[in-house]
Amino acid sequence: MLRLTFMILFSFSFSFSFCTKYFSSSLRLLLEQSPPEISKEGKAKWLRNLITMMERQSLIRLWSSFLYISTLFWMQVHSHSEYLIGLGSYDITGPAADVNMMGYADMAQVASGIHFRLRARTFIVSEPQGKPVVFVNIDACMASQIVTLKVIERLKARYGDLYTEKNVGISGIHTHAGPGGYLQYVVYIVTSLGFVRQSFDALVDGIENSIIQAHENLRPGSIFISNGELLDAGVNRSPSAYLNNPSEERSEYKYDTDKEMTLLKFVDDQWGPVGSFNWFATHGTSMSRTNSLISGDNKGAAARLMEDWFEQREELISDEIPRRVSSIIRNHQDSHEELLELASYFESQPGRAATRVSSSARRVRSPLRKADKPGFVSAFCQTNCGDVSPNVLGAFCLDTGLPCDFNHSTCGGRNELCYGRGPGYPDEFESTRVIGERQFKKALDLFNKASEELQGKVDYRQVYVDFSQLNVTLTKKDGSSEVVRTCPAAMGFAFAAGTTDGPGAFDFTQGDDKGNPFWRMVRNALKTPHKKQMDCHYPKPILLDTGEMTKPYAWAPSILSLQILRIGKLFILSVPGEFTTMAGRRLRDAVKTQLKSSGDKELSGGEIHVVIAGLANGYSQYVTTFEEYQVQRYEGASTLFGPHTLTGYIQEFKKLSKYLVLGRTVQPGPQPPNLLDKQVSFLTPVVMDSTPGGDSFGDVISDVPKNLSVKRGSDLVAVVFQSACPRNDLLTEGTFALVERLEREDKSWTPVYDDDDLCLRFKWSRPKRFSSRSQATIEWRIPESASPGVYRITHFGAAKRLFGSVQHFTGSSSAFVVT
């Protein structure tokens, strides 16, 4: 007890300078609440309770620091673990209606429901008496500079300087099926009709809350790392550009995409495994540009499979991949006739009023029903996926069925009919599941095999670099050097051609290094690039001179964040773009070589692990090699800062890694702009919702047939409800759709599937574009693992009255039988 008291008082004295006037009252409260004897198991819970009381007295920053420091001291005394680890997860789904999706830049692709939900997943790692590193993986197309700035602002308000832009990395999985409008530069929000505040807020709130969870879960633990090959989850979609790399370089690699997955396994000293994060290169484009349901695509699906597997692994003993099954359901051996008779007593319930918490409380994975131990967190992170497609069957012409042109990805000279095919072709949902399942299987294998424990320093370095005018030193083959410069951002003609994952429109083609007079005329109406800019980007013909377009505000970024997070011999390179396969290899190899020659004793023996976290802390499109850039396929045309962009990245990351291992301070560099106050939006708000006369919100429009009996693994059940716009309430950490199973004993309904399950789809629609009426269709594709019994489908929503008040509602279908 004396040792514990000493540590608490020492920790408190560290925080004393922040809030001297609270010292007496806070110390008294601490002594009053301190139990006479604290067990090892109870210490974390007691501290969390204590911190909650302190927050109620407006001491959030003081006592959050106190909690963190006290935990560090406890770790020193009671644990032999190398690190403190904490994981967190939070809903970032955002608006499921009316908002353009980010990724394909197709104005017709507007959200109208949910395939499954999006999440922010976080890990925090720290040494005793050291600052932590934070990594957040978000189910979004990419990280956003303005989102990152806002998250850091909030973290500083809560924790002081504990979490800053230097040690917090935020990376996107690159799904093309999430709400857009959350980036701050004009070119990325044109198709979303400007800035979408709901998308932005959902991301900022979710990222912040996932970090808060991880911080509150900080406990002694260990980290293990594992690597392995996954061969069937990605193909190179620009092989002609890859082949332009030097043959001697290509000969060093077996494949034209990176096949290695790197996985971290987090093990709590008391709770055992609590999470895993892995990095693997494949695009989030299993879902096509015709899809309108919010989805985490293949990486989000893999994360859902992994998290559900872990939560169910003790209940389910099977060699097959588990599906979502509620562990509290008991399988009664009722006859089919008995089940039908039982179901007949439960007809559809009319729509009725509900509360906001109704949806959250009924969620299958509701935190309201969790035990003391936090849920398992598994993230499938993005890396150098720039030229890697999940559509592994190849690209074919829609009209002829023949392979597309190799060099230009065209069909009869045009790009619009050339599409890549996923393994579930023509079903994009099946392709998403299959590619996700393949990543899940490999991650599970690596998770079970992970035996190399990470040990050593936790550190970080971060810098802002102006890539519009960066001096880059090139080393020639003869040993001489030349200084060149990067360019202000610009996009080439082939950018508008799109890719085989999502072709563009009009007569643009990949591999175009000339352009054409008509589109030059259109370009010049916006901004005519000057000769110096055209020479700098050569051989890219400039279609949009975005780096020099500033009205109504900047069209493209110029100042980018580069960051390295270190955990022992693992180095995470946070890059604000999509590196191609070979570009990523060159960056990793350059940093690894720099680290090996640093003289750091920790790095002298064993393997150094270097992973690239793509689309991190901001977004600046693609990064190709110099040789790939010459071909001017989509990726080269989208390399914003010219042919020497990659060399600039390598130069700056070598500097960062040198400063990191030598313990030197890095100058922060020029600060990026905060354009939040300049944002404009043309997305119309929800005015009101209505129903036909006599109907209520939540009423069933199309019910299940009477005496319906369906089979597991093959049948689909669909119910249509009177609904309202999902933008009225995003139901964050809730659900719009629910499948419930009847408990025979007490006639209660148990939630078994919700809108975060791959088998359940929530589809929302209006009869006309500006109609105040809408309906929700909930489709349940009954999985093989569903238990036989009596089921019903329930819908939750929120309706807006003419004068702004929002009323929550719910409704349920008639019961039916699953056999």
What positions do the PLM features span?
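Short, low-complexity, intrinsically disordered N-terminal modules
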Residues: F16, L27-R28, E32-K40
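Leucine-biased recognition of intrinsically disordered, low-complexity hydrophobic segments
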Residues: L2-L4, L9, L27-L31, L47-L50, ...
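Non-catalytic substrate/cofactor recognition surfaces at enzyme active-site rims
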Residues: E55, Y68, F73-T819
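Intrinsically disordered, low-complexity proline-rich regions
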Residues: L9, S25-S26, P35, Q333, ...
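Cationic, low-complexity basic patches in intrinsically disordered or flexible, solvent-exposed regions
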Residues: Y22, Q33-S34, W46
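Cleavable N-terminal signal peptides of Sec/SRP-targeted secreted and luminal proteins
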Residues: R3-S15, I60-V77
